[in-house]
Amino acid sequence: MLTHEISENEKPREKLQNYGIEALSSSELVALIIETGTKNESVLTIANRIIMKFKNVGEMQYASIEEFQLVNGIGIAKASKIMAAIELGRRISIVTEQEEVVVRCPEDAVKLVMPELAFLFQEHFHCLFLNTKNQVIYRQTIFVGGLNASIVHPREVFRLALRKSAASIMCFHNHPSGDPTPSSEDLLVTKRLAEAGNIVGITLLDHIIIGKNKYISLKEKGYF
């Protein structure tokens, strides 16, 4: 059934206007994002095909742009729109009133960063900046790419910490392989960060490696 053959009440846009966004199915939401069908297929047919490709809607957040393009009827433009919508939703989901977040243990911090780091395809080096009450006052990804001592410069980390008047920091990076076991480079970077923190008076509370649904705290393991 082509788009022009669908009754006005069944079209996703009209359904949203009449009944609200909550009334739309996942396929209808995807149809709104990709906007158009093809010469031979309606936008809803293509949207249904996208939903059926994945086990559930949540799995879509881990798909690459190439995986979306494997769906018949999805080119680079439509795939880009889907990726943008997913990324926007991800960013919204991790927004918190950071000044009210208190980190009492590694698990508290991991809950903040795991959704953002666990399934990335590249290594990201991320920092939480805390005040004297261990409240998160700022967070930022500092580096993207392979973690090694030549890329991760303590001065970049602590320059930002000083600018934010942080009393301490917690560092994180992900292993795209899903295995959080630290490498020799991970340990070297951690040692350099801890030493730099001692010099400037800003404590490195922990360096946590994020894997797929698991993590390793280098502080808890006694690496520094």
Curated annotation (Swiss-Prot):
A motif (JAMM motif) lies at residues 173-186. Coiled coil: none annotated. It comes from the Bacteria. Belongs to the UPF0758 family. Pfam families: RadC (PF04002), UPF0758_N (PF20582). Keywords: Hydrolase, Metal-binding, Metalloprotease, Protease, Zinc. One of its GO terms (molecular function) is metal ion binding. GO terms for biological process: proteolysis. The keyword Protease applies. Residues 102-224 form the MPN domain. The keyword Zinc applies. SUPFAM superfamilies: JAB1/MPN domain, RuvA domain 2-like. Zn(2+) binds at H173, H175, D186. This is UPF0758 protein lmo1549. NCBIfam families: PRK00024.1, radc. CDD domains: MPN_DUF2466 (cd08071). Signal peptide: none annotated. InterPro entries: MPN, RadC_JAB, RuvA_2-like, UPF0758, UPF0758_CS, UPF0758_N.
